[in-house]
């Protein structure tokens, strides 16, 4: 995709790093940028990893401060004194209302100013925690809304949308990045380097990796 530019919404976690590496291979390193959001998340260690990975991969990274979210919403992802639990509706209390809507909005504003039309997000509705703003129907509706709001032809890509975590690990392996993503990315909601293996994010990550490695042995 020569002469086309892409912006990756980048957290430093498994999914967004997979998307960033795929974007580099698809569009070319010189045509890819990363945008990262600081919104008061308790797992701020991922911000450090995001900066390191972006620099290591040679990609320009922009970090935006959305910490104002603390003024209007409260949840366990932004309160390190709260226990991470699953609500009666099956959604963990780490869900941040409006987060992905805001991420896509600010990413689109930035992208238009940079002449970028392709926006890439690592959201997924297969192996996920039940967050409503990770669903394909939401992303598609947001794509239409942003195009109308800014009179611009954005294309929001979600390459992991229908992949299981095991399949996401397989994709990383296909790109020659399995070990890199295992060793360099951070996913833990509790902000523990190497993972706590107890929070919803760690459980999904470790279970998916185990499934993929087991299937790889069987081949």
From Swiss-Prot:
UniProt-annotated binding residues for ATP: 10-20
Pathway connected to this protein: Purine metabolism; 7-cyano-7-deazaguanine biosynthesis
Cofactor(s) the protein requires to work: Zn(2+)
One term of GO molecular function: ligase activity, forming carbon-nitrogen bonds
EC number in record: 6.3.4.20
Cofactor, free-text remark: Binds 1 zinc ion per subunit.
Protein purpose: Catalyzes the ATP-dependent conversion of 7-carboxy-7-deazaguanine (CDG) to 7-cyano-7-deazaguanine (preQ(0)).
PANTHER family according to UniProt: 7-CYANO-7-DEAZAGUANINE SYNTHASE
Name the UniProt record assigns to this protein: 7-cyano-7-deazaguanine synthase
Originating gene: queC
């Amino acid at each position: 995709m020569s002469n086309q530019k892409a912006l990756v919404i980048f957290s430093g976690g498994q999914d967004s790093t997979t998307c960033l590496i795929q974007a580099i291979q698809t569009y070319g390193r010189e045509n890819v940028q990363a945008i990262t959001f600081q919104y008061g998340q308790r797992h701020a260690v991922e911000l450090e990893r995001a900066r390191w990975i972006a620099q290591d991969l040679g990609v320009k990274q922009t970090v935006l401060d959305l910490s104002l979210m603390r003024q209007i919403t409260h949840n366990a992802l932004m309160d390190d004194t709260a226990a991470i639990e699953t609500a009666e509706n099956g959604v963990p209390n780490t869900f941040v209302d409006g987060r992905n809507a805001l991420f896509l909005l600010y990413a689109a504003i930035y992208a238009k100013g940079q002449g970028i039309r392709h926006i890439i997000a690592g959201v997924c509705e297969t192996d996920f925690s039940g967050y409503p703003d990770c669903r394909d129907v939401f992303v598609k509706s947001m794509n239409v809304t942003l195009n109308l709001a800014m009179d611009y032809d954005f294309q929001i890509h979600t390459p992991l949308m229908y992949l299981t975590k095991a399949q996401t690990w397989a994709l990383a392996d296909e790109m020659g990045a399995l070990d890199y993503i295992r060793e360099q990315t951070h996913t833990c909601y509790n902000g523990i380097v190497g993972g706590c293996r107890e929070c919803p994010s760690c459980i999904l990550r470790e279970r998916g990796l185990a499934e993929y490695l087991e299937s790889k042995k069987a081949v």
